[in-house]
C-alpha cells in the first residue's frame, strides 16, 4: 500500500515539473520560438483551432518567426488571433505568409521576465510540496488503519521527502537555465 502512495506521489511530482516546463516555454527569451504560439486559438470556420494546426511555423532566423498557413484564406484570422492573444508581438502579413519579428529585449524587460520565471518556479515548488503533503496524509491514514507500521510510515515519509527534494532541485535547475537564457544578450 505504501509503495502505491509513493509511486502515485512520484508521478504527480513529475507532472508538476512537466507542467512547469511547458509554462516556461511560453516565456520568450528574445529568441523566436514557435512555442509562444502554442496557446493561440484561431476562429476558423466558427471553431477555435490552434494555430499550429492551421499553418507551418518555422524559425528561419534567431529573431524571426514565419507562419505559412495551409489555407491562404485563413491568413487574416491567424493574424487577428495573434494580436488578440496579447503576446506583445506584431505580425506582418504579405498575403502568403505572416512574419513576426521578435524585438531585442531591453534590460528592464529581461528583469521582468526573470521575475515571471521565478514566480512560475515558486508555483511549481508549491505544487510539488502539495503532492508531498497529500502523500504523507495518505500514509498516515494507512498507518491509522493498521495497513502499515509506524516504522514503515517513517520510511515512506523519508522516501517522499527525498523525491520532493529531487523534484524541487529539478525545478531550480530549469529556472536557472531559463534565467541564464533570458539574461544572455
UniProtKB/Swiss-Prot annotation:
The family annotation for this protein states: Belongs to the RRF family.
Q: Where in the cell is it found?
A: Cytoplasm
What's this chain's function? Responsible for the release of ribosomes from messenger RNA at the termination of protein biosynthesis. May increase the efficiency of translation by recycling ribosomes from one round of translation to another.
Coiled-coil stretches are none
List the lineage, top down. Bacteria, Bacillati, Bacillota, Bacilli, Bacillales
Question: Which protein are we looking at?
Answer: Ribosome-recycling factor
UniProt keywords (A-Z) are: Cytoplasm, Protein biosynthesis
Per the UniProt entry, what species is this protein from, by scientific name?
Bacillus cereus (strain G9842)
Q: Which PANTHER family does the entry link to?
A: MITOCHONDRIAL RIBOSOME RECYCLING FACTOR PSEUDO 1, RIBOSOME RECYCLING FACTOR
Instruction: Cite the Pfam families for this sequence.
Output: RRF
Which InterPro entries would you find in this protein's record? Ribosome_recyc_fac, Ribosome_recyc_fac_dom, RRF_sf
The record's GO molecular-function terms, alphabetically, read:
ribosomal large subunit binding
Gene name in the database record = frr
Which Gene Ontology terms of cellular component type are present?
A: cytoplasm
* Any one GO biological process: translational termination
Amino acid at each position: 500500500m505504501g509503495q502505491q502512495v509513493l509511486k502515485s506521489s512520484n508521478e504527480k511530482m513529475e507532472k508538476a515539473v512537466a507542467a512547469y516546463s511547458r509554462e516556461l516555454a511560453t516565456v520568450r527569451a528574445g529568441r523566436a520560438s514557435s512555442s509562444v504560439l502554442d496557446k493561440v486559438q484561431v476562429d476558423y470556420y466558427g471553431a477555435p483551432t490552434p494555430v499550429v494546426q492551421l499553418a507551418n511555423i518555422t524559425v528561419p532566423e534567431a529573431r524571426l518567426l514565419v507562419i505559412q498557413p495551409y489555407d491562404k484564406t485563413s491568413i487574416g484570422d491567424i493574424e487577428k488571433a495573434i494580436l488578440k492573444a496579447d503576446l506583445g508581438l506584431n505580425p506582418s502579413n504579405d498575403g502568403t505568409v505572416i512574419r513576426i519579428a521578435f524585438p531585442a529585449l531591453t534590460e528592464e524587460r529581461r528583469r521582468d521576465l526573470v521575475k515571471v520565471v521565478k514566480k512560475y518556479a515558486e508555483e511549481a515548488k508549491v505544487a510539488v510540496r502539495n503532492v508531498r503533503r497529500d502523500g504523507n496524509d495518505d500514509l498516515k491514514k494507512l498507518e491509522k488503519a493498521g495497513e502499515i507500521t509506524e516504522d514503515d510510515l517513517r520510511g515512506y515519509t523519508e522516501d517522499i521527502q527525498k523525491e520532493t527534494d529531487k523534484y524541487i532541485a529539478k525545478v531550480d535547475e530549469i529556472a536557472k537555465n531559463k534565467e541564464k537564457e533570458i539574461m544572455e544578450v
